[in-house]
């Protein structure tokens, strides 16, 4: 494992989606918890639980592959800002994913949030990833 926890999280979710696995374990940190809560609120995952195993806190994400009640199916997760190349944007230049169907997750001075919320609050920040 590398030191980039966000990339590890995105890769784990992407691999679980490709193998049609129902659940995926991710190391629980403040950042991964915030991103997972956003994915849950936006309807890209079904469930989120925290558990402890061998002294490590883990997040158990429940994925879904069928549309239920206007929920979204995660087809693409892409890490944008990386430790070697940070990508920042002001609130006017935050990109739209699939014309607004997907979301952009940003790290701002007010915490981690989605693109719509950042535009509304007129806050820019570091673009963490695209989800569609």
Swiss-Prot record:
SUPFAM superfamilies linked to this entry: Ribosomal protein S8
Keyword Chloroplast: yes
Localization, UniProt: Plastid, Chloroplast
Keyword entries, A-Z: Chloroplast, Plastid, Ribonucleoprotein, Ribosomal protein, RNA-binding, rRNA-binding
BP GO annotations: translation
InterPro entries: Ribosomal_uS8, Ribosomal_uS8_CS, Ribosomal_uS8_sf
GO cellular component terms listed in the entry, alphabetical order: chloroplast; ribonucleoprotein complex; ribosome
GO molecular function: rRNA binding; structural constituent of ribosome
Subunit structure: Part of the 30S ribosomal subunit.
Entry function: One of the primary rRNA binding proteins, it binds directly to 16S rRNA central domain where it helps coordinate assembly of the platform of the 30S subunit.
Family under the similarity heading: Belongs to the universal ribosomal protein uS8 family.
Protein name (record): Small ribosomal subunit protein uS8c
Lineage, opening ranks: Eukaryota, Viridiplantae, Streptophyta, Zygnematophyceae, Zygnematophycidae
């Amino acid at each position: 494992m590398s030191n980039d926890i966000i990339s590890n999280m995105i890769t784990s979710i992407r691999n679980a989606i490709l193998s049609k696995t129902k659940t995926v374990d991710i190391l629980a940190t403040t950042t991964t918890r915030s991103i997972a809560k956003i994915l849950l609120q936006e309807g890209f995952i079904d469930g989120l639980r925290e558990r402890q195993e061998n002294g490590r806190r883990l997040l158990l994400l429940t994925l879904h592959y069928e549309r239920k009640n206007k929920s979204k199916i995660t087809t693409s997760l892409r890490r944008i800002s990386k430790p070697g190349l940070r990508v920042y944007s002001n609130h006017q230049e935050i990109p739209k994913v699939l014309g607004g169907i997907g979301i952009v997750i940003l790290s701002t001075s007010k915490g981690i949030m989605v693109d719509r919320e950042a535009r509304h609050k007129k806050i820019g920040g570091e673009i963490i990833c695209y989800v569609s």
